[in-house]
Swiss-Prot record:
Residues 1333-1349 have a biased composition (Low complexity). GO terms for biological process: adult locomotory behavior; axon guidance; axon midline choice point recognition; axonal defasciculation; dendrite self-avoidance; flight behavior; homophilic cell adhesion via plasma membrane adhesion molecules; larval behavior. The gene is tutl. CDD domains: FN3. Disulfide bonds join 150-227, 275-324, 366-419, 462-513, 558-611. This is Protein turtle. Disruption phenotype: Adult mutant flies are unable to fly and roll over when inverted, explaining the name 'turtle'. In the eye, axonal tiling of the R7 photoreceptor is defective in approximately 22% of axons. Double knockouts of tutl and bdl rescue the R7 axonal tiling defect.
């Protein structure tokens, strides 16, 4: 008999061994096997049975049942490899024979049987206990899914048909329940309870082909599972694949038993709260009360593994919400139960303090619970039901939950609101909150009139109501802002009123106040008239002290008188500090007017009394003291106490003792607070005011009173004083637990039993408001009465910090924070602190949003823009100032070396750049002028020969015209006929005769030697030469003829307009009612110069010589005339030497008397000449030293003739010697003025000796020659056509015109059309243009013609001139000479007056010359006196010395004669200027030489003081204009 065990299939099989029929067969079988030792055979059998191998299989992968659910499980597999014996039969253990033919003994058989039985039992136990050890353990969550991974191992790796079966072990007996069976091509078998939850995994999944998917796991699914794979058509003994799995199902906790949601209890009852939960693993039970863990105490405990919470003897602090929490590794659940006291309502959510704006809605909550739940809620405001408050009746609402709503709120709604709840059982419960209504500050009342007492302190009231509190008040007085903070005698009070410390009359006025608070203002008050009046005055004042005995009477007197204009004051008596008289006193008091009488005095009558006098102006007060003697002592006062642990020291001030003869002692009354019995202690020594009471308990509050006593008895008791003794020094702490605090902990280590803790603050929140962040919370529900203060902790990192600096009172439940940093996250906690403990609220997280300070950015941007604008403005101003200073410096240097170039320079400089008249362009005339030669294309070519004098040439271009019918029209360039009242005689001229020499054109030409210079630089014509012109000496003496610059003109009743359109300064000199400015304003004409000058030296002599030739008869030229002319110009200093005339005739040799006089101009009326030499500055004339004149140049100059000379600058004269032009070129010294100023300054002080030498060379015949100093001469312009189209007169240049043009293009655009002007003299007629009027340049003494400041290009003002207003035209006269004019005859040399074609005629030059020549003492004096220098206002303003100063007091000079020497043998003198006629010394045509003597020494100036005064006034006016200009330029 044998037993075999198939360990590979884990099945035990029993084989029954058969006995051979014959002994022979047994013996043969034994013989066929080798002999073995019994022990070895037994060992081999046991080894086959017990040989096992244990192998650890790697953990399987985590499987997922579905995408939505994941089964996380742990695989713990121990696979034991068993040794399998592959044999046809079972392994048989046979008895061992010891010898051949011997049989086993009974003992051996018994041993074998026992051994086999034991092995069978062990194998059976091994089968039962090996399954769990080899299983794969999987953990899954309840309700989720799991996959059992099972692989199929085919025999020899060849797929064969198989059956898949999954079994679940349902009992310890080993019975299996097939839950899933699968065979290919057959329907699946699923056990009941697993349908819809089990399935075979897909073949393309990463799991084994035999894997099973189990979903929606239940707790019953926990257990053992086996995967079986049975291969068909195989030997049953073939091994089978299979795996064991153990499934553990975990479940989150869930309650199986919970307490009721609301539990009603009575105080003193006991309750048990039961809370049980199921789950895998077993959950843990925790208890919380109002979000805080329940602390075990003698009355509160947790039992039965935390499932029960027992509360015995319920108190008020035990009422609240209790929460049971069950938790395990899979989650947690909670349940809350409310414990409410039955029988009375309890407020669960009390109201909180609120602050609202006016007009908003406010809600006060008041939630209450009670048993039974019929809770009634009532609301009160300041003790009155809100339903009964009339102001709230229509705006208040009470909800069912007890909340109070007020909508909208008003300022008067501020106050305390109380919520009271009750259900009829017990006392009502109440809670209160305060409502603060904020609104802008406003004025509630505005008195019409307020009075201030004169010379006393007074107050101007502003009745203000404000919430929040008032911040400031602004005041206005008489509609102007009042700054009381800047005044010493005005103080702004806390309520916004004005306190005047000493009133004066200046404080009277109309006042208004405007209050402001955090919400702004509601507006200003009305206007209050504040009147200053005298206050009432005391006429009788009470005495300072009244002493009376008990029972006596006292009479106190008081009276006052009102001030004038005020009401009579009222007088009343009162006790000190405004206390009214007591009832007992009123029966004993008599008041008569201002007198008061108190009878039957008592001790209580002792004290201070006030006499109050008041009216509408002021309230005055007089104080007196009434002392009652013979009474008990009065009560001590000002009691103070100092406490220790066991003693208190008291101090006080004694009261009135009852009289000086009474001595008082003191007794201390004290008791412990809350105790009814008082104890007394006498104070020793007698009269002491300090005592120490010992033997008191520590930490106890005591009450004290002090009473005085004298011989009359005990006095009055003092006020009660409360003092608390100090606590004993604390002993060393015991039972202190040492703990390591985390770095973020803000809690302090406290010993055990530190005292009761208050409940934690609730509902902590952080909200952002307009002015910061508001942290709010609610007071604790438990032990809120022990809260002493709150503390707020915060952190942004690990360290907790205290937010509030001081303690927050327990009634406050909010805190405003203003300095939180944007972009950070803050954590807050609120601590409720008691005396010895505290409790913390939950941590609140608040991220502060990152804020951009838009206002700061805007302010920065605006500030930056403003900064750049200011910088630009300052830079421009600095550049302008620097440029202006630089120009002034340059001009100052320029004026140091250059004479003031006036008329001729401006003429030449301006005409140099002129195009022909048709283009209408002009030159700016700036200094220096630009080089431009193209403008001379209309001129004849000239030679520029440096170092030679320049010949002045005045050409008569049309000598063939002999008719003088229109010849007088050409004199209109002197003065326009419509500018004077009676100018007809001005434009009439006699037939001037000159037989000195022939001009080559059939006419006669006078010698230059007839012209001499007077003391002031004017030219004088010899009278003898005048007589040859057809005027008699009587005519000249009678004043009917004017001799002006070599021309004689008859005038009759001329009334020249004295008006000038210029307003920029200057002075006028009056001569015989003919008014001329110091620098004469030319008539308002807009024509170019009519005179072209070809010299920079004393070229005016040629001009005068030309004037003498006007109208002269043609005659032979005297042999000495050219020499005179040469002498006149030989000493001249020049710069540009022009090409000689192409004609070899003399200067006026080609002039025809019958044709109009042709005057060279720059405007282009002459034929164009080829220009042989053009320097870099062709239009400049440099002042340079004369150099040797080449002979051929001199020959060319002397033989020049014709009419194409290159135009030169008449004003480029200077006595200063700059470097020679042959040596180097210097800066142009041309005048910087657009219009000349008619006068050249006298420069005799410079190079006087050189000038004298030049004059000697120029006058070899000893004739006196005054240096050239005359107004700018007139000039003519030749026109292309003889008839002129008259153009309107316009003033087309401002006073600073020259600076406005910097190039030719601008000049062409700015040019105005010039009027065509005609010039008719006696025997010539030539259409010519008129020189531009110098409207903006008078004398340099005028403030508008500043020497150095008004440089071209500077920022001087642009003064637009008024339009020209033409005066009435002069009347025509019927006759010019005696009866000839009356008879309608035109004498020889007279003018017809064609009004339609009469151009303007600049007579300003002639009138000014006459006025200046009259100031000279004698034209024949050998040496002219030096000009008087009036001086200058400052370094920039100079005055022409040759200009007399007019004044209202200055008499017109009528005794001055105009004496002109035109020839050594002919002298012409103009008599005194009287009336409108000029008188001649010789009759017309007379040849006798007759000279009128002049006074020897006449003053150069009429009235210097008046002139200086006028100069000062105009200087001040100029300074004012200059300041205005600078201000405008800066702005």
């Amino acid at each position: 008999m044998g037993v075999c065990a198939d360990l590979g299939s884990h099945r035990w099989c029993r084989a029954l061994s058969t006995q051979h029929n014959t002994e022979k067969s047994k013996e043969q079988q034994q013989q066929s096997q080798p002999l073995e030792i019994p022990e070895q055979r037994a060992s081999k059998c046991r080894g086959d049975i017990d040989r096992t191998t244990t192998t650890t299989i790697p953990a399987s992968k985590t499987l997922t049942a579905s995408p939505a659910k994941t089964a996380a499980f742990t695989v713990k597999t121990t696979r034991r490899r068993r040794s399998r014996r592959r044999a046809e039969g079972s392994s048989i253990c046979v008895p061992i024979r010891r010898g051949q033919g011997s049989t086993p003994t009974p003992t051996i058989q018994v041993l074998q049987f026992v051994l086999v039985s034991l092995l069978a039992l062990l194998a059976k136990n091994a089968q039962a206990h090996n399954i769990p050890e080899d299983a794969v353990h999987i953990t899954a969550i309840l309700g989720e899914g799991v996959i059992f991974n099972c692989h199929v191992e085919f025999p020899n790796d060849h797929p064969v048909p198989y059956v898949l079966q999954w079994d679940k072990k349902v009992s310890e007996t080993g019975s299996d329940l097939p839950i899933y069976i699968w065979y290919e091509s057959y329907p699946e078998h699923i056990e009941e309870g697993y349908k819809g939850r089990v399935s075979r995994v897909s073949q393309d999944s990463p799991f084994g082909s035999a894997s099973l998917n189990l979903t929606n796991i239940r707790e019953s699914d926990q257990g053992w599972y086996e995967c079986k794979v049975v291969f068909l058509n195989r030997d049953p003994k073939q091994h089978k694949n299979g795996t064991w799995f153990h499934l553990d199902v975990h479940a989150p906790p869930r309650f199986s038993v919970t307490p009721e949601d609301i539990i009603y209890v009575n105080l003193g009852d006991s309750i048990i709260l039961n809370c049980q939960a199921d789950g895998t693993p077993t959950p843990e039970i925790l208890w919380y009360k109002d979000a805080n863990p329940v602390d075990p105490s003698p009355t509160v405990g947790i039992f039965n593994d935390g499932t029960e919470l027992r509360i015995s003897t319920i108190r008020h602090e035990d009422i609240g919400e209790y929460t049971c929490i069950a938790r395990n590794g899979e989650g947690q659940v909670s349940h809350t139960a409310r414990v409410i006291i039955a029988g009375g309502a309890v407020i669960m959510v009390p109201p909180t303090n609120q602050t609202k704006l006016e007009g908003e809605k406010v809600i006060f909550s008041c939630e209450a619970k009670a048993m039974p739940g019929n809770v009634t809620v009532r609301w009160y405001r300041e003790g009155s039901p809100v339903r009964e408050v009339a102001a709230l009746e229509t705006r208040v609402t009470i909800r069912k939950d007890g909340s109070l709503i007020i909508n909208p709120i008003k300022p008067d709604d501020s106050g305390q609101y109380l919520c009271e709840v009750t259900n009829g059982i017990g006392d009502p419960q109440s809670a209160s909150a305060y409502l603060s209504v904020e609104y802008p500050a406003k004025v509630t009342f505005t008195p019409t009139v307020q009075y201030l007492p004169f010379r006393l302190a007074g107050v101007v009231q502003c009745y203000i109501k404000s919430s929040p509190q008032l911040q400031y008040v602004t005041w206005t007085k008489d509609k102007r802002l009042l700054e009381p903070y800047q005044m010493k005698d005005i103080v702004v009070m806390a309520n916004g009123s004005l306190l005047f410390t000493r009133v004066n009359e200046e404080h009277q006025g109309q006042y208004a106040c405007t209050p402001y608070n955090a919400q702004g203002t509601a507006g200003a008050s009305g206007v209050m008239d504040v009147l200053v009046r005298k206050p009432p005055a005391f006429t009788v004042e009470p005495e300072t002290l009244y002493q009376r005995k008990v029972g006596d009477s006292v009479e106190m007197h008081c009276d006052a008188l009102e001030a004038e204009g005020t009401e009579r004051p009222t007088i009343k008596w009162q006790r000190q500090e405004g206390e009214q008289l007591t009832e007992s006193q009123r029966n004993r008091i008599k008041i008569s007017g201002g007198n008061i009488t108190i009878e039957n005095l008592r001790r209580e009558d002792f004290g201070y009394y006030q006499c109050v006098v008041s009216n509408e102006v002021a309230t005055l007060m007089a104080v007196t003291q009434l002392v009652i003697e013979g009474t008990q002592p009065h009560a001590p006062y000002n009691i103070t106490g100092k406490a220790t642990e066991s003693s208190i020291t008291l101090q006080w001030l004694p009261g009135y003792s009852g009289g000086s003869e009474y001595k008082q002692d003191y007794t201390i009354w004290f008791r412990e607070a809350g105790v009814n019995d008082w104890q007394t202690i006498s104070v020793t020594p007698s009269g002491s005011t300090q005592v120490t009471i010992n033997g008191l308990a520590s930490g106890t509050t005591y009450e004290f009173q002090v009473v005085g006593r004298n011989v009359l008895g005990d006095g009055m008791m003092s006020k009660v004083m409360t003092v608390r003794t100090l606590e004993d020094a604390p002993a060393a702490p015991r039972n202190v637990k040492a703990a390591t605090q985390p770095p973020d902990s803000f809690f302090q280590l406290m010993p055990d039993e530190a005292g009761p803790k208050p409940g934690p603050p609730r509902n902590v929140s952080v909200t952002e408001v307009s002015n910061g962040f508001l942290i709010t919370w609610q007071s604790p529900l438990e032990r809120a009465h022990i809260v002493k203060f709150y503390t707020i902790k915060y952190r942004t990192d690990a360290q907790w910090k205290t937010l509030n600096r001081g303690q927050i009172r327990p009634e406050e439940t909010q805190y405003l924070v203003k300095n939180l940093v944007g972009g950070r996250t803050y954590y807050f906690r609120v601590l409720a602190n008691s005396e010895k403990s505290y409790e913390s609220s939950d941590e609140v997280k608040f991220p502060v949003p990152a804020r951009v300070k838009h206002k700061a950015i805007t302010a920065g941007v605006v500030g930056g823009i403003l900064f750049f604008i200011v910088a630009i403005i300052l830079s421009v101003c600095a550049v302008k100032i620097c440029n202006k200073r630089k120009r002034r410096k340059q001009e100052k240097e320029f004026n140091m070396v250059a004479c003031r170039i006036t008329d001729a320079r401006n003429i030449a400089a301006n005409n140099h750049h002129l195009h022909n008249r048709s283009t209408g362009s002009i030159s700016s005339g700036q200094v220096p002028l630009k080089n431009n030669t193209e403008h001379y294309r209309d001129y004849e070519s000239v030679f520029i020969v440096p170092g030679h004098p320049v010949i002045i040439k005045i050409v008569q271009t049309n000598p063939n015209i002999k008719s003088n019918r229109h010849s007088h029209c050409h004199l209109h360039w002197i003065w326009p006929p419509d500018r004077c009242t009676n100018c007809h005689s001005i434009y009439s001229s006699p037939n001037l005769e000159d037989g000195d020499e022939d001009d080559g054109g059939g006419g006669r030409r006078r010698s230059v030697s007839r012209i001499q210079r007077s003391l002031d630089g004017r030219f004088v014509l010899d009278v003898e030469g005048v007589s040859k012109l057809g005027y008699s000496q009587q005519t000249l003496e009678s004043g009917n003829v004017d001799v002006v610059d070599g021309g004689l003109f008859e005038r009759r009743n001329s009334n020249v307009s004295q008006k000038s359109s210029s307003d920029d300064g200057g002075f006028l000199s009056r001569r015989n009612f003919i008014t001329a400015r110091a620098s004469w304003r030319r008539p308002l004409v807009a024509s170019s110069s009519q005179l072209s000058l070809q010299s920079a030296a004393d070229s005016a002599r040629g001009f005068l010589q030309g004037l003498l030739k006007i109208g002269a008869k043609q005659s032979a030229v005297p042999p000495n005339s050219q020499s005179y002319f040469d002498e006149a110009v030989s000493g001249a200093r020049y710069q540009n030497v022009l090409r000689p005339y192409t004609s070899s005739n003399n200067l006026y040799g080609n002039a025809d008397r019958s044709r109009p006089l042709h005057i060279n101009t720059i405007s282009g009326s002459l034929s164009q000449q080829q220009q042989l030499y053009t320097p870099s500055r062709i239009s400049r004339i440099f002042s340079s030293s004369p150099q040797q004149l080449q002979p051929h140049h001199q020959q060319l100059l002397l033989s020049s003739g014709g009419s194409g000379a290159y135009p030169t600058h008449f004003s480029d004269l200077s006595t200063v010697y700059p470097p020679n032009s042959a040596e180097r070129s210097s800066h142009n010294l041309s005048s910087r003025y657009r219009y000349y100023s008619q006068e050249l300054p006298s420069l005799r002080t410079i190079q006087e000796e050189t000038r004298r030498q030049q004059q000697q060379k120029q006058h070899p015949l000893e004739d006196h020659f005054v240096p050239l100093q005359l107004p700018s001469p007139p000039s003519w312009r030749s026109y292309y056509q003889s008839q002129a189209s008259y153009r309107p007169r316009t003033r087309w240049y401002p006073r600073h015109h020259s600076r406005l043009f910097s190039n030719r293009q601008q000049q062409h655009e700015m040019l105005s059309p010039l009027p065509q002007l005609n010039l008719n003299l006696r025997n010539s007629m030539n259409p010519g243009g008129l020189e531009a009027s110098p409207e903006s340049r008078s004398s340099s003494s005028g403030f508008g013609s500043k020497n150095t400041s008004n440089h071209p290009g500077s920022t001087s003002e642009w003064r637009l001139l008024p339009p020209y207003r033409a005066p009435p035209s002069p009347p025509k006269h019927s006759g010019y000479f005696g009866g000839q004019q009356a008879q309608g005859q035109t004498p020889h040399g007279s003018y017809s007056y064609p009004r339609a074609t009469t151009p303007p005629y600049t007579m300003a030059h002639w009138l000014e010359m006459i006025s200046r020549l009259n100031a000279a003492t004698d034209s024949n004096l050998p040496k002219a006196p030096c000009p008087v220098d009036v001086g200058s206002v400052d370094g920039h303003y100079e005055f022409d010395p040759a200009t007399p100063t007019p004044s209202a007091s200055s008499m017109l000079r009528e005794d001055l004669n105009l004496h002109i020497d035109t020839h050594p043998y002919h002298h012409h003198t103009l008599g005194p200027l009287s009336g409108s006629l000029l008188h001649s010394h010789a009759p017309y045509g007379g040849g006798a030489r007759k000279q009128r003597s002049l006074p020897a020494h006449l003053p150069r100036y009429d009235n210097v003081e008046v002139r200086l005064q006028a100069m000062r006034e105009e200087f001040y006016a100029y300074r004012k204009r200059q300041a205005m200009q600078q201000m405008e330029s800066v702005c």
